[in-house]
UniProtKB/Swiss-Prot annotation:
Main location: cytoplasm
Protein name per the record: Ribosome maturation factor RimP
Signal peptide: none
Biased composition (Basic and acidic residues): 270-279, 303-314
UniProt gene name: rimP
Entry similarity comment: Belongs to the RimP family.
Amino acid sequence: MDLDGKVQPPSAQVGQQPLSPDAALHEPRLLQESGIAARVAVLAAPVLADLGLRLVRVKISGQNGTTVQIMAERPDGTMDVEACESVSEALSPVLDVEDPVKQAYHLEISSPGIDRPLVRLSDFERALGQEVRVELKTGLAGRKRFRGTIGPIEASSPIGGSKGALRLTRTDAKPEEETEVLLPLDDLHEARLVLTEDLIRQALRAAKAAREGDDGNNEEQDEEQEEPAPPRRGPGRFAPRHKTQNPEHNPAQNPISARAKPLVPAGVRTEFKKSKTGERGPAQKPHLASQAARKSDTGSSRSGHDMPRKPAPK
């Protein structure tokens, strides 16, 4: 990225050597939002970077009223529910103060999923050989939408512009059309992977490898935590009487609950939703909100003070 904030030609980024962790975290996107989504993206990007995550996309839809969807991931493409929750807790106060969305909305933090959008050069490198749908802004030879297999990024293409051009082997080409095309990334409007059986198999293999790696880490933790138990002794005659603690609530006595939760590999969708409904005004007390939530889940219920009392016998 140069001093003007523009993406450098891919010759300096693609096909040379892997990006450093800091460079991968701050790798610029090829696409930018517009309108309110752009304002949310400007606020969300630094918050995500502080958490070691990077922004994929911001989308605002009218689903369930108004939904603000923020896709995020780690530089390696992984994500987990805990990270989504951390983003929601860190980003919600910022959105409340800056107030980019005027009406009530639902905040949804999620990973990109299997059929993910491709928004960075590294996304195209990682998806090399996969099938993709591409939509251009102005089009190429009178055509805006293409579908085909992802090839390498051409840095020296005359139509590539400052971001290069994507070599695509078309699967939707007619007999009289060329199957090999170069799509300028400067004109890119949207690129999304096609959900195929091969893509699903790769995601399942990645999830299996992540689980096996997590099981190995848990076994090492179990071996480290296994220590000879001290001999049991009676409480004694004058020992204070207390309730026996449930070992399930003590992480030290229950190594299973102390295990680290596995990461969700790249391509597996995970999300965390947080609703922000009602008119803007003073915040409700937590216990009132929790009572309202319980009533909405279990139906209307009466407390002991609301139950009708029987008349006293005469």
